[in-house]
C-alpha cells in the first residue's frame, strides 16, 4: 500500500494523507455478500449512550466475511481485492470451484489469480487456512480462532500478525500483536501470513470533517467541563488540585490510567503466559 501526502494548499491539506488504493482491483462489491448495516449512534436499545463520540458518517453496507474458512479441500481463486469501509484491512473475493463466492481478509502479498485452500493438510502458503498443529514454528499467522469452529477473532486489523512461538501438548503458544503471549488450543485454525494494508497506521486524517465521514464525533476534555459533568471539571484555569482532579479519571470516577479492570477470576487468565503490559 502506498500513501499520498498533500501539500499545504489549505490548512486542512497541510498534513493530510490517504491511501492510493493501488492494491484494490474492484470498486463495486459483490451484491450477494452484502447485508444492511443500521447505525446505532453509540446508543443501546433503551436509547442511552453507551459508547461516546459515535454518530453520523457515510452510509455503509456490511460485507459478510468468512472468518471460519470452513470450506475444506475445495480450491478457491482470488477474483478481486476490494475496499471494506467497515475495517482497516482490505478484503479478497474468492470464487470456489463449486461456484460459491466468499469474502476473506486479504493477507499481505495476496494477488488476483492466486489459488487458496483450507483444511488439515494444505500447503504452507500465504492465505491458506489450517489448524495450528500443522503450522511450523516461527510462522506468522492471522485470523486466529480462540474456540475451535467459532471463526477467527485475533489479529484481524491492518498490518496485524501473530507469531507461532511453541507447541506443547494440547496448546500452541502465540505472540500477539499487542505483545501478549497466549496459549490457544492446537485444533484452532489460523491463516498463514500477516494482514495487508500495513501502512494504514501512517494515514493522517488532517481535518475534523474527515473524522465525521468515518462516524467519529468530537471529544471534549474532562478538564474543560464543569464539575457536574466530569470528575476533572471545574477550577480556575487548568486546575489539577482539589475536587478529585489530582488523578485522571473517567466520567464515572474510575481511575483512567493504569487501573486493571480485567476480572481476576476469568477462566482464560490461565492461558495468558505474559500480559500485554508486562515488562
Swiss-Prot record:
Q: Can you name this protein?
A: Large ribosomal subunit protein uL2
Q: What UniProt keywords are attached to this protein's entry?
A: Ribonucleoprotein, Ribosomal protein, RNA-binding, rRNA-binding
- Organism lineage string: Bacteria, Pseudomonadati, Chlorobiota, Chlorobiia, Chlorobiales
Q: How does it assemble?
A: Part of the 50S ribosomal subunit. Forms a bridge to the 30S subunit in the 70S ribosome.
Residue ranges of region Disordered? 34-55, 221-279
Q: What GO biological process terms are annotated to this protein in UniProt? A: cytoplasmic translation
Which Gene3D superfamilies does the UniProt entry name for this protein? 2.30.30.30, Nucleic acid-binding proteins, Ribosomal protein L2, domain 3
Q: What does this protein do?
A: One of the primary rRNA binding proteins. Required for association of the 30S and 50S subunits to form the 70S ribosome, for tRNA binding and peptide bond formation. It has been suggested to have peptidyltransferase activity; this is somewhat controversial. Makes several contacts with the 16S rRNA in the 70S ribosome.
Source organism per UniProt: Chlorobium phaeobacteroides (strain BS1)
- Organism domain of life: Bacteria
The cysteines covalently paired via disulfide bonds are none
Q: rRNA-binding: is it a keyword of this entry? A: yes
Task: Quote the biased-composition stretches of kind Basic residues, using this chain's numbering.
Answer: 40-55, 259-279
Composition bias (Gly residues) maps to 232-242
Q: Which NCBIfam families match?
A: rplB_bact (TIGR01171)
State the similarity comment.
Belongs to the universal ribosomal protein uL2 family.
